[in-house]
Design a protein with these regions (language model features):
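Recognition helix of helix-turn-helix/homeodomain-like DNA-binding domains
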Residues: 28-43
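Key DNA-contact positions within bacterial/archaeal DNA-binding proteins
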Residues: 21, 32, 60
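Alpha-helical residues within the helix-turn-helix
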Residues: 14, 25, 53
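Short C-terminal boundary/hinge segments that cap the last helix of small helical domains
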Residues: 56-69
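A short, Lys/Arg-rich alpha-helix, primarily the initiator
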Residues: 1-22
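Short, basic-rich loop-to-helix N-cap that marks the start of a DNA-contacting helix
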Residues: 40-53
Length: 69
């Protein structure tokens, strides 16, 4: 089974001293999407793209797919 991890996003936010509420505001996504990100649950590609715009990065810089055994 495969799962998604947003640990890279958490590190990027910490490195840029950005709180989740600030990211929600500038990337324009809902508290529901923020909760899903926090729980390592899938979110829409649109949300990921807006986050990438904020950090000027690629999707692979904010998340990764992990194979669970």
């Amino acid at each position: 089974k495969m799962k998604i991890s947003y640990n890279k996003l958490q590190k990027l936010m910490a490195d840029n001293q950005m709180k989740r509420s600030d990211l929600m505001r500038v990337a324009e996504f809902s508290p529901y999407a923020a909760t899903k990100l926090n729980k390592n649950e899938p979110v829409s590609l649109g949300v990921l793209m807006r986050i990438c715009e904020v950090f000027h990065c690629d999707i692979g810089d904010i998340c990764e797919v992990i194979l669970e055994e």
